[in-house]
């Protein structure tokens, strides 16, 4: 960030070729993607919580439309417990063709869907697949794991955590990565999958909105259909959803968090000292916690299905501080008390008259300092210089037992 605090580094941490670098100079609050170095794995798009990095081959919304039509058509034709198999062209398609030519082919309920890179699948794809009726999702990858799959493995963990929290976990993982170069091993793994149907009708919502909005909509549809009415589901670290918890007793309403939040999850009330938080917009980047001067913000990755998560909630509100001279409203009482406590040990504010200046607004403070004869450049009072006679006099008094 521009304040030299570190926030979200998901794409920087996962890029296998180092194509993503933090900006410098005028671009220091951005990240730079070098098209010449990028290998096209899509790991950055898979984990980006804001949609700043997206994969265009195909776009997520186009992929979700294909996925929705595939699953709903299968359900309308009488199919049950479908398994979606995502694969690429170079490795996956050849493996499926070999299985069809030399073996029994894919099981009837396995629906293959080709993508450019399986490592580019973001969380919205998993949420949409399960909401639209998929009983399981499998990603086909080479046996020798590539460097770009760490991002999609995170999304698999997040999807599994949500399903487990909603009581929808199956006897086998519903989302997993199949790493094999053997077509017969692929066929055996898919045939061995148990039929893990959810037991409720697939959702019918359209694939509209950003990937983040689609992920939230998909998980909400699953929660509405699930028998367990869970409100909050805990998620692993670095999940794209969560709460930024503020310790109210230590918050001074300085509003530093509102100026750095990239998604406006933290906002201020322009009419009075008030801090608001919108949980659905929080991407757990950590900039607020790193910037908070009081260190009272902590991150809690979770998925909150309560209606309050979709509306700004008041985190803390205080009465504004009024200038005792002109009654102008400025700052908050807590922030002024905090400043006075920090400056109480400073020599410039040892005098109570100096401390009283902090209770005034910016205009009255200048007038009081000018009319009161306060010299802002005056140093602390110098101690009286002690001479040799002073030391000898003290020694004589000590001999006589005088204090």
Give each language-model segment a name:
Residues 125-182:
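Cofactor-cradling patches in redox/metallo enzymes
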């Amino acid at each position: 960030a521009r304040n030299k605090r570190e926030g979200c580094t998901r794409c920087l941490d996962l890029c296998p070729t180092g194509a993503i670098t933090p900006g410098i100079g005028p671009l220091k609050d951005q990240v730079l993607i070098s098209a010449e170095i990028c290998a096209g794995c899509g790991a950055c798009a898979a984990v980006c919580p804001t949609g700043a990095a997206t994969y265009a081959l195909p776009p997520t919304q186009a992929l979700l439309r294909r996925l929705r039509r595939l699953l709903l058509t299968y359900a309308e034709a009488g199919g049950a417990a479908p398994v979606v198999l995502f694969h690429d062209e170079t490795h996956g398609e050849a493996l499926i063709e070999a299985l069809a030519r030399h073996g029994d082919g894919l099981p009837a309920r396995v629906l293959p869907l080709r993508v450019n890179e399986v490592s580019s699948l973001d969380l919205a794809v998993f949420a949409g697949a399960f909401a639209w009726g998929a009983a399981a999702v499998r990603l086909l990858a080479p046996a020798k794991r590539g460097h770009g799959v760490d991002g999609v493995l995170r999304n698999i963990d997040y999807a599994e955590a949500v399903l487990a929290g909603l009581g929808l976990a199956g006897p086998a993982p519903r989302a997993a990565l199949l790493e094999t170069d053997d077509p017969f091993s692929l066929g055996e793994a898919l045939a061995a999958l148990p039929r893990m149907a959810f037991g409720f009708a697939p959702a019918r919502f359209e694939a509209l909105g950003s990937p983040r909005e689609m992920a939230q909509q998909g998980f909400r549809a699953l929660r509405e259909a699930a028998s367990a009415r869970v409100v909050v589901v805990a998620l692993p670290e670095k999940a794209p959803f969560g709460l930024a918890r503020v310790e109210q007793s230590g918050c001074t309403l300085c509003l530093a968090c509102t100026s750095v939040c990239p998604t406006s999850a933290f906002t201020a009330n322009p009419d009075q000292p008030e801090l608001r938080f919108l949980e659905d917009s929080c991407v757990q980047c950590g900039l607020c916690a790193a910037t908070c001067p009081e260190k009272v913000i902590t991150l809690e990755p979770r998925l909150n299905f309560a209606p309050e998560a979709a509306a700004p909630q008041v985190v803390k509100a205080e009465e504004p501080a009024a200038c005792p001279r002109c009654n102008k409203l400025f700052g908050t009482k807590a922030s002024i008390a905090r400043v006075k406590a920090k400056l109480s040990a400073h020599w410039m504010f040892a005098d109570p008259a100096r401390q009283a200046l902090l209770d005034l607004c910016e205009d009255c403070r200048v007038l009081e300092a000018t009319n009161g004869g306060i010299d802002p450049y005056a140093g602390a009072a110098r101690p009286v210089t002690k001479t040799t006679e002073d030391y000898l006099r003290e020694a004589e008094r000590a001999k006589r037992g005088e204090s």
